[in-house]
């Protein structure tokens, strides 16, 4: 299914969720189904995890390179979490939107709240069914230490409180159901006449 063409500026969608909620999986499903939807690739100063590819999963750069980009105002938004920077290229997002592509930023709630003040976008929060289920998912993906999982769970509680500032909330209890809701939001927002009511 196509959503628009190159004659209309693409929309901006912000998707946030605690780590392990399935936000990246859901966004990847959208990108696979809709040729005019593209997910932004964030810059980060953290080391790649096993199997991650520079330029596909993230742009992995040094802290000094990241700070130079901050000084040059290259980021649409950026945050520092757990001593690691994450940021979104301002220029890349604008180019994609001018080409008529709908851009999805998968970012944390801090970055999303920054953007609410700066640009028109649709904000979507993905919620886990429970914190216990989230803990199980984080343990089962086996990418982080128990100490980091505990930090992520503490952060998740704060992120869940930020959901009230989003336009939509989806509970990811069943991946296919959550995807159908996310897909419906994307289609409805594309057909919206005006964001300002």
From Swiss-Prot:
Enzyme Commission no: 2.7.4.8
CDD domains recorded: GMPK
Annotated Guanylate kinase-like domain residues: 10-187
Keyword annotations from UniProtKB, A to Z: ATP-binding, Cytoplasm, Kinase, Nucleotide-binding, Transferase
GO cellular component, one term: cytosol
Residues annotated to bind ATP: 17-24
HAMAP family: Guanylate_kinase
Listed name of the protein: Guanylate kinase
Organism: Protochlamydia amoebophila (strain UWE25)
């Amino acid at each position: 299914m196509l959503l628009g063409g190159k004659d209309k500026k693409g929309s901006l969608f912000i998707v946030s969720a605690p780590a392990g909620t399935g936000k990246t999986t859901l966004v990847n499903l959208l990108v696979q189904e809709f040729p005019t939807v593209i997910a932004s690739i964030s810059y980060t100063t953290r080391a790649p995890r096993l199997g991650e590819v520079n330029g596909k999963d993230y742009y992995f750069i040094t802290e000094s390179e990241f700070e130079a980009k901050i000084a040059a105002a290259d980021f649409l938004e950026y945050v520092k979490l757990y001593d690691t920077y994450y940021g979104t290229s301002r220029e890349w997002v604008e180019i994609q939107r001018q080409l008529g592509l709908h851009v999805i930023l998968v970012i944390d709630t801090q970055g999303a709240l920054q953007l609410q003040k700066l640009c028109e976008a649709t904000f979507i929060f993905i919620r886990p069914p429970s914190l216990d289920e989230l803990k199980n998912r984080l343990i089962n993906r086996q990418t982080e230490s128990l100490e980091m999982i505990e930090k992520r769970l503490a952060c998740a509680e704060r992120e869940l409180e930020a959901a009230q500032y989003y336009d939509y909330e989806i509970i990811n209890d069943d991946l296919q159901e959550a995807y159908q809701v996310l897909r419906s939001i994307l289609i409805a927002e594309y057909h919206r006449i005006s964001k300002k009511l």
